[in-house]
């Protein structure tokens, strides 16, 4: 099952992003002021938690559950926006171009901050800044850039096919639903078969829930303060999804690659929380429409 999912999920994500980029004019991809506040929250919190973890390790050398919990929170904050966030944002009436722009910017920040801060917590002689930087770029950007280029080629070279794609407005959302079902199935299996103690699992679960609540709340608060976008709901929806809906598969990979392996489970827990919230938001939005 996991092997099949590892092949199918990237294809689904690529297709979702391709369909999303088909609906965005290249000139619409530009930064907004609220982007910088969200970057400050994600990057600043990650740096502060990294320093805190380093101080604890310096004072109490060795592996402990406390460092695992702090590292789990680090992952929850620095994890970039989910590639499917644009699909949910569009369903909720948000600005797809804005959240897509933020997704690109936050991935650049992650590529710089993670290699800079992780050595404070987990020094590794064979993991230089540029090695870690290249690992992250190779993991993230092909799945972001290739659908973008493919969509723009179709837009300008195959306009009839492009119009045909636009005639199926809910196709990306239906693909997201399939992708979500697969992700939840894999997540539940990983949690059930985890060898971690019940107490540590409960702690990681609580940390992931708290981080999820804080980020959705902060994003909506900041987005709302920047007013209304013509043709969309106010920025609260877009900013909330930008910082709250995470690329949890990437968080799991970062946990295994850069931090304590136990932290990788936090991506699974976060996936449950943000998808429960997304499902509730979509249900409420559809009920009010």
Feature-to-residue mapping (PLM):
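Alpha-helical transmembrane segments of multi-pass small-molecule/ion transporters
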Residues: 1-289
